[in-house]
Amino acid sequence: AQSAKQVISLRVKEAEKNRQYEDFIEKQGQILSGIIKRLEYGNVIVDLGKAEGVIKKDELIPREILKTGDRVKAYCYEVKKELKGHQIFLSRAHPQFLAKLFFQEVPEIYEGTIEIKAVARDPGSRAKICVHSQDSSIDPVGACVGMRGSRVQTIVNELHGEKIDIIKWTEDLPTLISESLSPAEIQRVLIDQDNKRIDIILTEEN
């Protein structure tokens, strides 16, 4: 009887682990929020309620200070199933963390009126995001910035002061490259389609 109870108990635990895995695999690619439980060798362990997530040291924003008990947001980039359970990997440095923050703060992006075309980040320093509006009457850059900068400022605060350049997407590649590399002054953009190479010539001051 004792052996049967142990088998049932193990199966219940296994079923619970599988259910938790299924719950979190659906959240992969989303922003999760939790309380910092502890710090281990520079990694941050986050209590997500029914499970723990880990933000590895190299997935943190450089120079940000996180403490036990703080509430933290992070992007769930991988849920890995293992024999002892599952691991939930989180990131605050991932480019998609920035993209998903814009999804949360800008209704036009959430609704699909504005599309995020590209994202690049130097975490903690500068980020660039290219946006395109499906509706010609809506300025994608203005919508992302918000009234008096309210929308983008919320994201900047979450990223501890990371400067965010919002760029209007264009099919004209030289123009897009020039806008993306601002504030550097571009003299010329040379595109070699055959060799898939782009040469950028800056003005002498740069």
Which residues does each PLM region occupy?
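RNA-contacting regions in translation and RNA-metabolism proteins
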Residues: 1-206
